[in-house]
Amino acid sequence: MAKETFKREKPHVNIGTIGHVDHGKTTLTAAITDILSKKGLAQAKKYDEIDGAPEEKERGITINTAHVEYETANRHYAHVDCPGHADYVKNMITGAAQMDGAILVVAASDGPMPQTKEHILLAAQVGVPKMVVFLNKVDLVDDEELLELVEIEVREELTKRGFDGDNTPIIKGSATGALAGEEKWVKEIENLMDAVDSYIPLPPRPVDLPFLMSVEDVFSITGRGTVATGRIERGRIKVGEPVEIVGLQESPLNSTVTGVEMFRKLLDEGEAGDNAGLLLRGVEKTQIRRGMVIVKPGSITPHTDFKGEVYVLSKDEGGRHTPFFNKYRPQFYFRTTDVTGEVELNAGTEMVMPGDNTNLTVKLIQPIAMEKGLKFAIREGGRTVGAGQVTEILK
């Protein structure tokens, strides 16, 4: 009887295919699963299974996304592929499918097209750290010089958006050829996965980041003090550690955690993913409210003015029926609370239509603990009309 092989938990990375319509994103996804399935590292998924992605709702926004998973020798990947361009825009802006890296698919026969460029820009805006390029359909291009020109153009486009265009790996291949089992092209898919393994960085584990917990509720326990409850988003907290309570006021409150509670049990520490109650020394119940965050001192600051990349829900998604203009004043929902803010559209933008994505500037009436990449919803009277994330902090 053979011994069970020792399974080491491989590190997990979220990845996705991006690029222009019909450049071969879905065929490539199918080819990756097909080739890795022969090594026992994936379940093969056919083109139609990926392309017929079911609709999902993320914060009221309808997105078609296909999820496949596979492994390489070193890592476990969750891979997203979206059938339509609008699905990508929504996915990236809402962070419905968090991407630690991306495979940019460019057809060698076309070169970078408008959506190629838009996806690169969006990836930069939403903080995708690195991408690997798959130059697809090279079997349809006889001219070596043309391939070189396309490669130069892709590298320039990446550099323009803040990626390291000069050092980004570009793999030349044919997804269709690989799917048909042609050895030459199968090898290029293997090269692609090697490049993804080595060039896309491992994401930091949430527990290793500075402590942050969003306050959902506050109550006082007679004789013990004030308890704030919420979900620990990142980091860990131990009894006796100092914290700051940030947001909805100009300057943070300082306190010390004197107890960590989960499911009515007292613990020594809480960590990312836990729903916990923190007992806070020297803080009155009236000083804390939902929407504040409890953090490692100095790790995050409150701000009112920021730029954001936003997707505005279409009428069919339950969004607005009419466009909005400069000085629009909705509520911005961050983590656990709504704050009113005034919108300033970019110069040259008259209005924003339902179904659009745009970059805009917001001035909140109260400060929120904020950092680049923070997600928010735009609401009117409790109804979600948009979603976005902070791309730059202004004040």
From Swiss-Prot:
Record key words, sorted: Cytoplasm, Elongation factor, GTP-binding, Hydrolase, Magnesium, Metal-binding, Nucleotide-binding, Protein biosynthesis
Gene3D superfamilies in the record: P-loop containing nucleotide triphosphate hydrolases (3.40.50.300), Translation factors (2.40.30.10)
Chain residue ranges for the region called G4: 136-139
GN (gene name): tuf
Cell compartment(s), UniProt: Cytoplasm
Membrane-spanning parts: none
EC annotation from Swiss-Prot or TrEMBL: 3.6.5.3
Name of the protein in its database record: Elongation factor Tu
